[in-house]
Amino acid sequence: MYIPVKKLAFMATLIAIALAIFTIEAQIPVPIPIPGVKLGLANAVTLFALFFKSGKERDVEKLTVANVFMILICRIVLGAMFTGRVVSFMYSIAGGILGFSAQVLMKQFVSHKQIWAVGAVGAIFHNIGQIAVAIFLTGAPVIAVYLPILIIVGIFTGIITGLAAQFSIKRLEEIS
């Protein structure tokens, strides 16, 4: 698959930003004592990539869903390697793919003023994917008891990441 150099450089920049955010966030202790809870701020970069209207007018070709998916997968794989949390890779990849799929589907029905909602839905499905992996790996369906708590926290954190992406896009469009 051929990717033009400018587009590839833009994707690499987004991966680097997401990795930096992910790595910094991994070092910050979470104030909520619930296993699996974190802000997931690196997802703001995924949302940004999914919604940003790059294009010929900005001298970068528009990112396709496949391009954004590549950014997500690179961030998850490299993030697991950089932080040394390889065990969490399976949780992240399952949650990331499920959350991304939900975000791609929802993108068709929202405007740029509702990216926060896409962030919330993505976080919910991310948590569902992680719980499914936990149940599969442990054989303990009782783990699903965490799901309502993770969904509530996920809505909150998803709104935050969605708003971060939404405001970033708005600001970049204003200065372009």
Spans of features found by a protein language model:
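Hydrophobic transmembrane alpha-helices
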Residues: 1-51
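Interfacial aromatic-anchored transmembrane helix boundaries in multi-pass membrane proteins
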Residues: 22-39, 66-104, 137-142
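Transmembrane alpha-helical segments of multi-pass membrane transport proteins and ion-pumping complexes
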Residues: 15-23, 76, 80, 96, ...
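Membrane-helix interface segments
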Residues: 4-7, 55-65, 85, 111-116, ...
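Short helix-perturbing small/polar motifs within transmembrane alpha-helices
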Residues: 9, 13, 62, 67, ...
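Generic transmembrane alpha-helix motif of multi-pass integral membrane proteins
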Residues: 39-64, 102-106
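Membrane-embedded alpha-helical hairpins and interfacial helices in multi-pass inner-membrane proteins
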Residues: 35, 85, 89-90, 108-176
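A short hydrophobic/aromatic micro-motif that marks alpha-helical segments and, especially, helix-coil
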Residues: 53, 62-65, 69, 77, ...
